[in-house]
Amino acid sequence: MTSIINQRWPLGNLMDGFPNGEKQNKLSFGGVPEKGYFEEFNKDPKYISFSGTPEKAYFEEFNRYRNIDEDDNRDTFPLFNEISSNPESESYLQTFVDNVRINTDINFVSKTNSFSQNDLSYLNATYVDKSLSLELPIKFNWAKTTSADSPDVVAKKKLISKPDNQYLCGSCWAVSVAGVVGDVFAVAGLVNWVPNISATYALIHYPQGRCKGGDPATLLYNIANNGIPSKHCVDYSWCSQNRTCTTADSAAHFGSDLSPLIPKDRGCYFDSEHYIFKIDSNIRTIVAGSGAIDVSNVQRTIKEYIYTTGPAVGGYIIFRNFTSKVPFGPHKGNSTFNVINGGVYLEKANYAQYRGEYGEHITEGLTFSSSNTDSDNYAGGHAISIMGWGIQPRIRVGNGPNDIADVPYWYCRNSWGTKWGMNGGYFKIAMYPYNRKSQFSKIVELMTPQGQHIRLGGVLAFTVSNPPVLKKLPANKQPPNPNSLSKLLDYYKNDEDDIVTKLPNIVPPSDGKKSTTSKTNNWYIYALIIIFILIIFFVLRK
């Protein structure tokens, strides 16, 4: 059955090939350098370029970390608090880690249709119908519950995905999409459990560049056409339980690409039933200057979409200062912006030069320079999940004594683990115009020092209309080694085969797991019917 939503947002055109035939300009998300694979070491062992950004990297630094003791385990990745007492060496290593986790292009517009006037009208009508208000809340966040939330919203927030860790595989294009797809099903009331969509399934079946990056828009079309299961089928154990993918000795493997670690078999771990999630094919890009969206309505449109539909996939430019680290103390290894000046990332801030105290309330000592957004400081592109928005009061935005402002921000879920960021893996990023390049609202064009043309920006929008379908999926020929998995075997043997309801006001159990209430209620109904029939039978016999 075709939904009203599908009629409103018809299938966008999926472009084959590249704009103007310029294949060399085609980049991919994922956090893995386009240039700088292992052969680059053979050409010049003293110099290598990651993500189009030159890095001074000496081959000896890689050799130094090839045989790290087992004590330096993945618990500290990606912060590497225990690696070395040599700050310079640690800085080299962290630079490589930062580059491998960052994507290199977010050109959603080339893959999807623009947000049309019909789309905009439908979204506005949906928002007004749901909120009974013309005013959006000043702050809203799918990752946090508040006293202002209705019971329905609280129930759905319990089903929202938590931050994952992509580790050293450049898979944020898959991890961000997997999280958001599950979130949108939860917000739509089509599931009463945390979906936990499998990013690994995407890397296997819709691989693109796998650990070398990919395009979230293309992946969404794949999911619309063919679906995707949960982590019960296959999860991220191939990386999270593999030292090569999680620890500092991975530095020796950056050039050789971690994609071969991804499972070769295309089946699930076990021959069992799993829920298949399919999204509607109405994938759109919300970005100013495209379709019915301009600077005047882009932020409200993104907010309305998130408020009514759920978290969204956003793409943005990362400059070097985004990953500038706290050098010491309890926050060591975290990006500096997370722990000062309200925790809001401002693209022109000199985070690398900051040497003051740490704390979100600290605003003094932070300086600003426009050079931070020069093309020389371009590090890559990144795909994340936008969870909501807010306003950070009275933070520093410039070098003047009166450069203090209430700054609107997007609240985002990253894929760098729970030890990075704030509140266990999240971060705030200033909205346009406080950030004019590192933001979601506008397309930004940039030329790298290597002459590579970059076009980034936008928010992907889609809907879901039908609940996931329980389906038996093929299993791998060989069962997995239990020691190589992150969970007990029973977790992977099936999804709980409860009834999936489409009621919009579904209230899940408090632990966020799937409910068997529906099945229990059905047995009561069947028993009552049988008793009623027996009573009628005996009455008629008399």
From Swiss-Prot:
It is found in: Membrane. It comes from the Viruses. InterPro entries: Papain-like_cys_pep_sf, Pept_cys_AS, Peptidase_C1A, Peptidase_C1A_C. The active site is at 172, 382, 414. Its EC number is 3.4.22.-. Disulfide bonds: none annotated. It is a single-pass membrane protein. SMART domains: Pept_C1. Pfam families: Peptidase_C1 (PF00112). The chain crosses the membrane at residues 520-540. GO terms for molecular function: cysteine-type peptidase activity. GO terms for cellular component: membrane. One of its GO terms (biological process) is proteolysis. PROSITE patterns: THIOL_PROTEASE_CYS. Keywords: Hydrolase, Membrane, Protease, Thiol protease, Transmembrane, Transmembrane helix. Its main location: membrane. Belongs to the peptidase C1 family. Probable cysteine protease. This is Probable cysteine proteinase 361L. It comes from Invertebrate iridescent virus 6.
